[in-house]
């Protein structure tokens, strides 16, 4: 029996959706353990595109899917995404979808605050999706969040709302924004309560019971480890922990329950929003990668910044997340290039270093040190075995493995789930 954590090792958009969908056939349960609806991914199943940003990927396969306590849940978006999937023919009932009773809710006031802050910042733009994720996590840490279970306790809900508004209305007065009426917020929550509560459960107990009888659990991370609130490119990060260890605290399981950590990495690098990006290519190569890779955000539609593979960053996240194997995606995007560069180190103030410093100033000053490899003209798209790959593509993969201290367990050669080469099965006992 094995339980697997899937974590992005870059800045998100690594192709986790396809890999999670591919692995979900081997799993009994799929769990989202952090983030909100700010990070989207697309699944391609039988030619149909499913765009998800909050609901676990396992739903498309009819697997028991859990939204863990580490996720912040926008109840209105939950209802909308549920309807969208159902309209596409996906059958979703409380029997296959559960939400942790102690998951915090994202409210309209969180979205307002997020947008007001982002538009009002002078100089420092974080590049948030303005969906209220950060403010919702602030209220969780500040012990004033409205949680899923509170929707069922209407006799105490108003008191919790008033406590929350004591904080938020003070902020709004300071920003010159109209205050929120407690009854209006109560009514807003009651509009969706009946659609949320049937899915509520004590999910840590459900996971423990499943573990005791040998169920296979797949823990699905959102975003990427380089957006982690502690280990990412702070302050250009998200508001939750995105490293693999968050699978434990974000779902209510112990570290011993995790048997394999699978890191996801693109064969090049992308980033959405602001922040340092040492290997970014603001040139024809960047345009080529963006167009060939269709690099536009699922949630925001924003154009992604593109650059060469950064082995320094991926190796750093492999170490921090305890990654045992890598799923390498979008190798086919590199088809046809005469040469391909890999960042193997940095220069910082005249010195060679092999890690990304935590200091924002140092991160902005590092200069990539590249090694250039010969490209390949043959197609890797839709390859189903190593024998189908050009020799130079295999050489590129092997060099990445050496640089990041992790072997490739899966290789994705197109968005279609069937175009996946399995080297090591993460669920193997």
Curated annotation (Swiss-Prot):
Annotated pathway: Purine metabolism; AMP biosynthesis via de novo pathway; AMP from IMP: step 1/2
Entry annotated with the keyword Iron: no
Entries under Gene3D superfamilies matching the protein: Adenylosuccinate Synthetase, subunit A, domain 1, Adenylosuccinate Synthetase, subunit A, domain 2, Adenylosuccinate Synthetase, subunit A, domain 3
GO cellular component terms, A-Z: cytoplasm
Residues holding substrate: 298-304
Active site (catalytic residues): 13, 41
Source organism superkingdom: Bacteria
Pfam families linked: Adenylsucc_synt (PF00709)
InterPro entries: Adenylosuccin_syn_GTP-bd, Adenylosuccin_syn_Lys_AS, Adenylosuccinate_synth_dom1, Adenylosuccinate_synth_dom2, Adenylosuccinate_synth_dom3, Adenylosuccinate_synthetase, P-loop_NTPase
Positions annotated to bind IMP: 13-16, 38-41, 129, 143, 223, 238, 302
Coiled coil: none
Cofactor note: Binds 1 Mg(2+) ion per subunit.
Residues reported in the UniProt entry to bind Mg(2+): 13, 40
Cofactor(s) recorded in Swiss-Prot or TrEMBL: Mg(2+)
Subcellular location: Cytoplasm
EC number: 6.3.4.4
List of residues binding GTP: 12-18, 40-42, 304, 330-332, 412-414
Keyword field: Cytoplasm, GTP-binding, Ligase, Magnesium, Metal-binding, Nucleotide-binding, Purine biosynthesis
Reactions mediated catalytically: IMP + L-aspartate + GTP = N(6)-(1,2-dicarboxyethyl)-AMP + GDP + phosphate + 2 H(+)
Alphabetized SUPFAM superfamilies for the sequence: P-loop containing nucleoside triphosphate hydrolases (SSF52540)
Family affiliation: Belongs to the adenylosuccinate synthetase family.
HAMAP family named in the record: Adenylosucc_synth
Subunit details: Homodimer.
Name of this chain's protein: Adenylosuccinate synthetase
């Amino acid at each position: 029996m094995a339980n697997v954590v899937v974590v992005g090792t870059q800045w998100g958009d690594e192709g986790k959706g396809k890999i999670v969908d591919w692995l979900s056939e081997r799993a009994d349960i799929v769990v989202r353990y952090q983030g909100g609806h700010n990070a989207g991914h697309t699944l391609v199943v039988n030619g149909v595109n499913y765009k998800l940003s909050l609901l676990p990927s396992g739903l498309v396969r009819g697997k028991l899917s859990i939204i863990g306590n580490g996720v912040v849940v926008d109840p209105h978006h939950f209802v909308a995404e549920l309807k969208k999937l159902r309209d596409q023919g996906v059958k979703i009932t409380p029997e296959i979808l559960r939400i942790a009773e102690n998951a915090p809710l994202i409210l309209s006031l969180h979205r307002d605050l997020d947008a007001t802050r982002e538009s009002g910042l002078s100089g420092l733009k974080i590049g948030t999706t303005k969906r209220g994720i950060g403010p919702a996590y602030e209220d969780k840490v500040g012990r004033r969040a409205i949680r899923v279970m509170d929707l069922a306790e209407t006799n105490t809900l108003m008191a919790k709302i008033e406590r929350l508004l004591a904080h938020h209305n003070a902020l709004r007065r300071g920003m010159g924004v109209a205050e929120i009426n407690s009854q209006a917020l109560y009514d807003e929550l009651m509009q969706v309560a009946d659609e949320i509560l049937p899915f509520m459960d004590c999910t840590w107990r459900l996971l423990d019971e499943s573990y005791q009888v040998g169920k296979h659990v797949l823990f699905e991370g959102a975003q990427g480890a380089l957006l982690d609130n502690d280990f990412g490119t702070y302050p250009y990060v998200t508001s939750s922990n995105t490293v693999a260890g968050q699978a434990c605290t974000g779902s209510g399981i112990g570290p011993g329950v995790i048997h394999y950590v699978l890191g996801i990495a693109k064969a090049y690098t992308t980033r959405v929003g602001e922040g340092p990006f040492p290997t970014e290519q603001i040139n024809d190569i960047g345009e080529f990668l963006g167009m060939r890779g269709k690099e536009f955000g699922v949630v925001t539609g924003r154009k992604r910044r593109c650059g060469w593979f950064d082995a320094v960053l991926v190796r750093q996240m492999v170490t921090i997340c305890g990654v045992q194997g890598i799923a390498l995606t979008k190798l086919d995007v590199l088809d046809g290039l005469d040469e391909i560069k890999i960042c193997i180190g940095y220069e910082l103030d005249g010195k060679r270093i092999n890690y990304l410093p935590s200091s924002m100033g140092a991160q902005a000053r590092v200069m990539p040190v590249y090694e250039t490899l010969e490209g390949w003209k043959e197609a890797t798209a839709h390859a189903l075995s190593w024998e189908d790959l050009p020799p130079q593509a295999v050489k590129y993969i092997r060099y990445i493995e050496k640089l990041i201290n992790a072997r490739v367990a899966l290789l994705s050669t197109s968005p279609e789930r069937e175009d996946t080469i399995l080297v090591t099965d993460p669920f193997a006992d």
